[in-house]
Curated annotation (Swiss-Prot):
Subunit details: Part of the 30S ribosomal subunit.
Chief location: plastid
Protein known as: Small ribosomal subunit protein uS3c
GO molecular function term, any single one: structural constituent of ribosome
Gene designation per UniProt: rps3
Intracellular or extracellular location(s): Plastid, Chloroplast
Keyword list, A-Z: Chloroplast, Plastid, Ribonucleoprotein, Ribosomal protein, RNA-binding, rRNA-binding
Keyword Hydrolase: no
InterPro entries per record: KH_dom-like_a/b, KH_dom_type_2, KH_sf_prok-type, Ribosomal_S3_C_sf, Ribosomal_uS3_bac-typ, Ribosomal_uS3_C, Ribosomal_uS3_CS
Pfam families: Ribosomal_S3_C
One GO cellular component term: cytosolic small ribosomal subunit
Superkingdom field: Eukaryota
Gene3D superfamilies linked to this entry: 3.30.300.20, Ribosomal protein S3, C-terminal domain
Source organism of the structure: Chlorella vulgaris (Green alga)
Amino acid sequence: MGQKVHPIGFRLGITQKHRSYWCTTPQKSALWIQDASFLRNFIKKKYIGAGITHIEIQRQDVDSPSLGIQIYAARLRQIAGNDSKGLERLQEELVKQLQIFYRKRNLVEPGTIHLRLSVKPLRAPEAYAEVLAEKLVEELEQRKPFRRAMRQTVQRALRAGVKGIKVQISGRLNGADIARSEDVREGPVPLQTLRADIDYSSKPAKTIFGLLGIKIWVFRGERLTRISNVR
């Protein structure tokens, strides 16, 4: 059977950036991976409707517990609030939750945690698969017909200027006894082309008939169209 690789992981270092920036000893690698995963999950669960596409975590010093978090989101006000102290409150809450995370797992606390937090807006939010998937999940959970929801998702993406998109829904569609998959595709989606700027997201939708699996691939154009430094 054919094996499918993750579209973003397939292009790391080519057209996709890494989401974590740090280098440490093998003893600390496992700990830093755990707390980075915890912070990402906590932020995404707390701000479900904010349209968070990805979160970058940076660490500069091996011996220091300081870290920087950069959130890329479609709706900044939902995260930062109306005043300038919204980010400060979130920053304090993240430090507190991280300390609780260490205590619950009997991990060695690194000392005073210095956390820098920033939020960056997205130029065209509906050109990102994560934002489109969140909206599609919301519509399906509100019992909108899945074919109409898929078509509207494609239309929103095309209006945002994407070159191509594929939307797939799997599960008991319309309450059918046998699960199946249906997809809608518009434009090219070259998954095997490394220079293609492909964005991908997969999410579950909890409906009255059970879970539906949602996958969205977005093709935003090609990068690395020429190589000028090779002779």
